[in-house]
Structures are given as structure tokens and as C-alpha cells.
């Protein structure tokens, strides 16, 4: 990258997330990649659609953006936090991926970061392929390994119960 670390927004955001300067260029590159892969889903997703509808209804910029932001949730744009909690708790508690899947199935609960309406095993999300490559570049990736173990089980049940882009982001960060 031609940016210096001081002018690199990805490095600055990474430092803000970590609470310190990042030690690894790979970490900064991962954060930059996450932003690039997450920035635009087109006008058909709820956050974009509600922003457009609100603006066309005559509301101002702030109201329109707020309308879009209010639709971020577990089914669109907000699954990263739930997925991060799943992977972190699973690893910290020494669970096997099968334990998490069984617990959620018995409770009839979704697993954050698992599942997609469009993508499935035979039609993978190209963003997840790019993100998965980062796991091979990290010194350790226990959360990613745990999440992939969950995916291995869930995709045996249904092909679209893949580790989605939010699940990948959560597992890598």
C-alpha cells in the first residue's frame, strides 16, 4: 500500500479496535479487506433500501441514514457480534463444535454467523473465500477452526448453513 501507517485508515481503525498499535501487517490488511468486502451489498438489502425509501420520502440525510442503520440486525449486517460470541465462548469453554450445534438445535436457536439465503456449499460466497485465506496467514486461528468445525456439521444438515461472511469476520477478528 502507498499509504503510510499514519495515514492508513485501516491501520488507525485496527489500532482503535485493539487499543494499541497493530503488531502485524496481516492484521491491518485483514481489516482493510473486511471493509472492502463489506462496504456495498447493492440497493436490495434492508439497510440500503430503507435509506433510499426514506430519502425519497423527503427526509434529510441524517434521517435517511438513521433509517438504514436501524435495520442492521442479526439477519443483515449485525451477525458479527453474535458470531464472535459463539466462537469465543465455544473456544474458551473448551466445547467441541458439535456441542454448540447440538445445544442450539435443541433450543431451536440460530447460530450467529451460520447460514445464507443466497450462498451454499455448491455456490460459495466469494467474500468468504478471500477471508478464509487470511486464516492460513495467521500464527494461530482457534476461533476460525472452531467456526469451520461448526460449519462442517451444519452443512451436513443443509447446504446453505455455511459459515457466512459475518461468521468469517467474527472468527478472524
Model-derived regions: residue spans:
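Hydrophobic alpha-helical bundle cores within soluble ligand-binding/oligomerization subdomains
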Residues: 1-173
